[in-house]
């Protein structure tokens, strides 16, 4: 027999493959899935242990008994039908066309019943099919070739044949054995099948006799009685049933539609009215409908009944809204409008909030003169090398850092010490808690030291003096203390209240003592903040990054800032996209006293601006846009308009020469410092006109603006893009790049001085006395004389002096010695000269020669 797969054996046994696999594995066979193969012995062993499950069906004997009863009932009907057929054959006028339309249906039903039985029933099914074929042949013999048996149900016959073909090999064996039955048995089976078919036909379709006229097989007239209904010819009852079903379904559908249409519309449940209508003047019907939970049409109708005709978009005044609220029977309360553009009010409210206060880190600003060691001090505290990256060792912007000491955090702000950065130092003093004043022990008190003291006193901030560079040979800390007493900073050792710490930032000496003093001072101040409210603070610095866009260094003074917060910074707004701490790491939130760098603003804010976090993005956007409009209006107001009052001043300014300048810098603070310093340059007759300032690299737009306005571009810590550089070379635009601010200031000052009209000073070079005159026709009067003093030059100016009075001032037309033209004649030599356009020369006139020399601008 060979090997057999699991799914084949499962099909023969009529059991699921999973069940067969489980039983095979229990018997120890190596079976994995339904495609595994079994030997003959294994298959027989598995068949012996498998319980065959049959589908639910009625037992075969019941089917057989019903078929037998059907045969007994239809014997009489079959005999009558055969007699009728014989009468039609004798007359020859009609051709009897007996169609057993439902024969195959009966066979298919028998076949279906037999399929559910075991081997014996399958044999009967096959015998029944053969007997049906035999009945067709017998019927053909009885009709004598005149009657034609047509099978109208070929499809059913095909299905029954297909079912018979799909039997298993056992069925084929049984049917083969049944083919050896004798003819008598076949004829009996044929009769049974025929009667059964007739019975089924009569039972399903009834006795339906119909006459049909048409052409017969040989062209004659054909009258046939159709007993029983087939698929095509006896289907009147079937059509009637089908029509009835269609009518019923159509009626049911129409009835359902009527029921749906007849349903009453659902009653809309209105939300209850609010107890108080909180409104703002200028609301329309749509806005009021949302507040009152009513449709705008209802609001408009009510107002119309009250004598007010409006549409849903028309703004309503205060009286109309209050009348509407009274008609609804509720109170009306006008909402107080908060000016979202007033950031100072929001900032003060957030700062003055005393709920949920918690200790915060102190903010310390380091101030002092240039090169007194401020950045070096922070360098030692942070263990980094910031100074090496600064241009010329000068801090150009505020640096914000955090240092941990004894488990506590201190925030340091490093401010520039150069004179140009006054505004940046003032900002640092305003946002700080403690000021550390760094004074070099060898230099003592310098101008920016005094300025830092004044800033700290104006901000009412305590000062800790750090006397630096005590390691230098010429250091004199006591002299520094004596100098500072003149400005009210008296050391504690001398009976004052100012803390002095002598340090060496270069070698890290006494730095721990300085940090201890800072923490002690912060404990005295009792610094607290509310971390649970919206964040508020100040802008330390702002810049435009090519990859990040607008960036701003902020100091959070109140609340906690999170990534994604809607924020208004000065005249700009945005949503916090990223936050970076002083170590360059991204963070998700920032608590009070934390310096951070954020991105996500729509523009670059100004250094020193305040920022406030809003509850929603829409309010933040509205506030930012309104503040930007207000700033633009203020800028336009500052544009000077010529009136009769300022006409003379405008005329005087028109006489002044201007140096047009475009300033581009890396950060906003540097832009402010450079612009302020250039405006302070005092050169008589020339002034600086700054036409544009911005942060970021020098681009093509800057070059185009400079070319149109004939301006100079000053780049501070920035460089032009390659496209801008090429365009500047083409358009002959002057771009000056600097890294140290006072170099830029000196260069602009020199350019301004060079624009002045040159100043000339008269210098007398010599004198000559006229002793003889010669009048020559067509030439004029020639004077001959002697050089009595200095040198007479050919290109010098001359004056004719007679009796101490200047008679004429002009130029020499010619200068000769004897007959030769010469360039100059020195003292003690004779000369001959002719004055241009002047012939009234007389003896004893004095000719004074002079030149105009340019005086350099001081």
Curated annotation (Swiss-Prot):
Bias-annotated ranges (Low complexity): 80-226
Ranges for region G1: 368-375
Spans annotated as G4: 468-471
Keywords: Cytoplasm, GTP-binding, Initiation factor, Nucleotide-binding, Protein biosynthesis
Compositional bias segments (type: Basic residues): 239-256
Region of interest: G5: 504-506
Region (G3): 414-417
CDD domains tied to this protein: IF2_eIF5B, IF2_mtIF2_II, mtIF2_IVc
Primary localization class, coarse: cytoplasm
Gene Ontology cellular component list: cytosol
Ranges for region G2: 393-397
Subcellular location: Cytoplasm
Function field: One of the essential components for the initiation of protein synthesis. Protects formylmethionyl-tRNA from spontaneous hydrolysis and promotes its binding to the 30S ribosomal subunits. Also involved in the hydrolysis of GTP during the formation of the 70S ribosomal complex.
Protein family per UniProt: Belongs to the TRAFAC class translation factor GTPase superfamily. Classic translation factor GTPase family. IF-2 subfamily.
NCBIfam families on file: IF-2, small_GTP
This protein's name: Translation initiation factor IF-2
Organism, as annotated: Lactiplantibacillus plantarum (strain ATCC BAA-793 / NCIMB 8826 / WCFS1)
Phylogenetic classification of the source organism: Bacteria, Bacillati, Bacillota, Bacilli, Lactobacillales
